[in-house]
Amino acid sequence: LAEVADVLAQPGVGACQTRVRIRNRTRLLAFVQDIEFACIADAGQSWRNRVGSVGLGGNGQYTRLSTLALLGRAPWSSCLVEDVELGIRLHLAGIGIRYTQRAVTSQQAVTDIRRLLRQRSRWAQGNFQCGRYIRKLMASREVTSLGLLDFLQYLLMPWLAVPLSIVIAVVLGCTIVFSLLGD
């Protein structure tokens, strides 16, 4: 908590996201999620630290009470990813969010594929809900150009994943068919 306190003591910072590690990573599905959080999410959040678009998500997020009070009597919404939405609203309000690798929060991973798919479906659906902030992010003077690009790719990816997957599958299929016909 000392590292989080140091981050929150920085001027203009109202929230902090810590690194997340998976505690029960002895099973393959949990191990893969640990790689996702410890490597991929860590690299993304470290980059976001530089461009000013650190996101809040799940465990390991800390927000000052005074920061939450700035958002009114009900700072959290009914959004499925209320943590992500809170981070977006803080950015729009010009409140800094920082990421720290030094403080680590551990959590249990979902070890059943059905539960993992349900969890990730909820996350994607929540990102759809956060799409309503795209116009505000684009118009905001509080969000940097690189930060905006990061927000856009994050919020638009659920919308683009299926169509892009179909396009890639068609191109790959055509490539295979044409290569077989050419022999």
Please name every model-derived segment.
Residues 27, 81, 85, 111-115:
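Charged, alpha-helix-enriched surfaces in structured cytosolic catalytic cores
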Residues 51, 111-183:
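Basic/Trp-rich segment in TM-proximal cytosolic loops or flexible interdomain/linker regions
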Residues 70-71, 108, 116:
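Residues that scaffold the ATP/ADP-binding catalytic core of kinase and kinase-like folds
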Residues 3-79, 121-132:
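Long helical/loop segments within the catalytic core of UDP-sugar-dependent glycosyltransferases
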